[in-house]
From Swiss-Prot:
GO terms for cellular component: small ribosomal subunit. GO terms for molecular function: rRNA binding; structural constituent of ribosome. One of the primary rRNA binding proteins, it binds directly to 16S rRNA where it nucleates assembly of the body of the 30S subunit. With S5 and S12 plays an important role in translational accuracy. GO terms for biological process: ribosomal small subunit biogenesis; translation. It holds the Pfam family Ribosomal_S4. Disulfide bonds: none annotated. Part of the 30S ribosomal subunit. Contacts protein S5. The interaction surface between S4 and S5 is involved in control of translational fidelity. Keywords: Ribonucleoprotein, Ribosomal protein, RNA-binding, rRNA-binding. It comes from Chlorobium limicola (strain DSM 245 / NBRC 103803 / 6330). It comes from the Bacteria. Gene3D superfamilies: Ribosomal Protein S4 Delta 41, Chain A, domain 1, RNA-binding S4 domain. This is Small ribosomal subunit protein uS4. NCBIfam families: PRK05327.1, rpsD_bact. Residues 93-173 form the S4 RNA-binding domain.
Length: 203
């Protein structure tokens, strides 16, 4: 599947939100948009621009390109409940996101690689599709040959217990996690407003 291969740091500066650990450190030093006039850009932002920016935030945070993101939106519309909430929940159930939330990788991009390279199993079966939808009760763990990889061990050792969300039970010692439940929207702390995205696609 195609992926964004540009500078995530530049995108982070343009959107004003850290999209990776590296970008977070960079934004602390240079909290303004890139380019010659990054520090002096002013003026009223249009409604469309605000909606587009929120969509870009969501796409880059979860590492998804436009076609797939629009498909998630269509699925969210088809489900019962609030469309925006449904959209966020679908993104949170992605396997690469659950791997990231479980502390197995310091970034979603790294988690995506772990999944794509076939290092993980779900309920005992190998899954190498980052977009795989995890369900309540699913057990995510590493294949025998992939256990105790340096990057994973390092990420887990640096992850405080407070990082792990209430809807995922993480066993750091055995490098496994159980997806307990689909999180409620208020439990997901991410810097975007999905309602503006819904308004954008509803036009």
């Amino acid at each position: 599947m195609a992926r964004f291969r540009g500078s995530i740091t530049k995108v982070s500066r343009r959107l004003g939100v850290a999209l990776s650990p590296k970008a977070e450190k960079y934004l602390e030093r240079r909290p303004f948009a890139p380019g010659q006039h990054g520090q002096s850009r002013k003026g009223k932002v249009s409604e469309y621009a605000l909606q587009l920016r929120e969509k870009q935030k969501m796409k880059y945070l979860y590492g998804i390109l436009e076609k797939q993101f629009r498909n998630y939106y269509k699925k969210a519309v088809a489900q019962r409940g609030v469309t925006g909430d449904n959209l966020v929940k679908l993104l949170e159930r992605r396997l690469d996101n659950v791997v990231f939330r479980s502390g197995f990788s310091a970034s979603r991009a790294g988690a995506r690689q772990l999944v794509s390279h076939g290092h993980l199993v779900v309920n005992g079966k190998k899954v190498n599709i980052p977009s795989f939808q995890v369900s309540p009760g699913d057990l995510i763990e590493f294949r025998q040959r992939s256990r105790n990889m340096g990057a994973v061990t390092d990420s887990l050792s640096k992850a405080p217990e407070s990082r792990f969300p209430s809807w995922i039970q993480v066993d750091k010692a055995n490098q496994k996690a159980v997806f307990l439940s689909v999180p409620e929207r208020e439990d997901i702390q991410e810097p975007f407003n999905e309602q503006l995205v819904v308004e954008l696609y509803s036009k």
